[in-house]
Amino acid sequence: MNKDYQIFWPSPSDPVRFEVDTSHEKVESISESDTMNVSNLSQGIMLSDSPICMETTSTTCDLPQNEIKNFERENEYESTLCEDAYGTLDNLLNDNNIENYSKNVLTQPVDTISISSLRQFDTVCKFHCVEAFDDEMTEKPEFQSQVYNYAKDNNIKQDSFREENPMETSVSASTDQLGNEYFRQPPPRSPPLIHCSGETLKFPEKSLAKSTAKESALNPSQPPSFVCKTAVPSKEIQNYGEIPEMSVSYAKEVTAEGVERPEIVSTWSSAGISWRSKASQENCEMPDMEQSAESLQPVQEDMALNEILKKLKHTNRKQEARIQELQCSNLYLEKRVKELQMKTTKQQVFIDVIDKLKENVEELIEEKYKIILEKNDTKKTLQNLQEILANTQKHLQESRNDKEMLQLQFKKIKANYVRLQERYMTEMQQKNKSVSQYLEMDKTLSKKEEEVKRLQQLRKEQEKVTASALDLLKREKETQEQEFLSLQEEFQKRDKANLEERQKLKSRLEKLLTQVKNLQFMSENERAKNIKLQQQINEVKNENKKLKQHVARSEEQNYVPKSETAQLKEQLEEVMKSDITKDTKMTHSNLLLDCSPCEEESLNPADIERSSQLASKMHSLLALMVGLLKCQDITNSDAEHFKESEKVSDIMLQRLKSLHLKKKNLDKELLKHKDRITTFRDLIAKEKAFQDHAIKVTDCDSDEAKSIRDVPTFLGAKLDKYHSLNEELDFLITKLGCLLESKESHCNRLIEENDKYQRHLGSLIKKVTSYEEIIECADQRLAISHSQIAHLEKRNKHLEDLIRKPREKARKPRSKSLENHPKSMTMMPAVFKENRNDLD
């Protein structure tokens, strides 16, 4: 409620206090204690012991008795006006308001009546305190601020009381609104507010101001506009039917003065102080009036007569106003009778309400004892439930622990299952790879088996060729024997001619012996050289071993490139070729030296065998190196190996064919030369036998000697060719054997790897089956754990239902009793609430 009040506080010279309401809104409602105390207030105003009467008597002691009587009449009139105002308030309340009031009393608690009575007593005390403070306020203006603060505190208390008792404030608000409307409506002939002069000041104004101050003290919640609207005219009362405009003009003048001297105070304190100041002004002005009257009596008798006439007119007007006031008082008395009747009805209603409240209290006491019994029962049930809860909590903790253990086991099994799945996937991938490798190995094995079959067929063909060659050699041998017989015949014929030549040859033999000695010396030197060559060969073997080790390391590291392997092959071939050429030269030289026709010792077969052995060893070393390099090539790339092996096999077959042809030719020539050599040896032996018996031979043909010397050189050259061809054949045969051995070893390796893979597959299959069994066991455990969890959840639900049932049983009777008597909820003990919270 926003209200703007302009309070004009007059100076000591101003006789009247005015208040103007600028809000044009509704006034705040008065409290219920003021409405219930209307009758007491009206009686308190009439008492002579009250501070109002004391003040009036004190102020009127210096005045004449007529004016005192008039003042008492006006005071009674104002008290009746106040009673009329409060009576109209009570009459304006309808029966509906009474019914609402009775209902509100029924719904209120028992202590509200005592509180309202205390509030009534408090308001009366405040009224007397206000009247007592008014004198002090006039004498000591320092108390004005204290009174203002007290009014604020009183307003705050009433607001808090209204918040605590909204039902009472609603009833009082309705009555206050009606009362405010009544006081705002001016009477049909409201006395105007007239400017006060020092001559014509009378005390009804003061009494009316006092009554308004009392009303404002009784109703501190009312604004100052309420006081202004119920104010009585300040000086001589004119005709009530006339409404002069002086009040409005005077109000404007006062507003102007009030703006210059604004002093805002609370309603009841400002009223008391203003009327005290007015009384002091009147006391000061009365002796002045008497002096002026005494001085002007002899001089202005005419003026006195006029004044008497005016006074008579004024008294007439007063009488008319008095008649109207009496009529109003009659109406007020009628209303008062009705009000008393309503009060009696209200008292009966209150008695009925009190009886009902007593019955309710008895019922509440009975219910209290019932609730105490129920409380004991519930305590017992709660103890049982607590025991059950303790057991259930133990079971729940055990079940939770089991559940956690099962969850941990499940997580472990799940992790193991995931790992097994990953291993299974990796093993399946390895299995697929091994299967693909196994299929590839099968293909390579099948190809190699086909190659082996081809080589076996070639071997059989070679054996057939060798058999046919041997047959041819036998035939040639027979032919040579026949030729030998023919040659023997010719030799016998020539023996005779040779006898002559022997003598010539003896002389030449001596020369030849010297040459043979020289040749022996040369052969010894060459043998020393051969020993050195053997040492070099041993060094080469060591180097070959080192190279083999280096090749093995390179195979492990797979770091040796193909270009280096090719260079190593070429270097080894060059070295071996150089060694072979040296060996062949040495053998040729040995053969040439040993095959001298002069001495049998020159033809040493041990040297020939050694040279052949050395050549065969060198060929075998070369074959081993080639085989190693080819094995390396096989390990590096199988496809290249197969291609190279096919090419090599084709080339070798062609070479074998050509070598077989050459071998046949050489075998034929060898047989011939062997026969010739045997013949020459026989001749040499015969010549040695006949040396003792020989005669000096002088005649020897130089042509025959030359032919004899040329035969060993020719035979040596052919033997060299034959040896070289045999070495090449042996080299090719060893090479083919190495290839076959490498292929067989490779096939064996593949078979072993295949067996390993099959074993690995078997172990993998076993592992997979074992993993599947483990997974099945884990699934079974999971199913068991799920079933256990479901069983535990069912048990928990069952236990929760058991816990809820006694709660619901305890709540049902309470809800019924609370529906009938909501006040019984306050009797619930705190212990039961704590137990209930524990259960929750």
UniProtKB/Swiss-Prot annotation:
Keyword Transcription regulation: no
Basic residues: bias regions: 806-815
This protein's UniProt keywords: Coiled coil
Domain of life where this protein originates: Eukaryota
Keyword Nucleotide-binding set for record: no
Transmembrane stretches, start-end: none
Region ranges (Disordered): 800-840
Pfam families: CAGE1 (PF15066)
Positions in coiled-coil regions: 303-559
Protein name (database record): Cancer-associated gene 1 protein homolog
Gene that encodes it: CAGE1
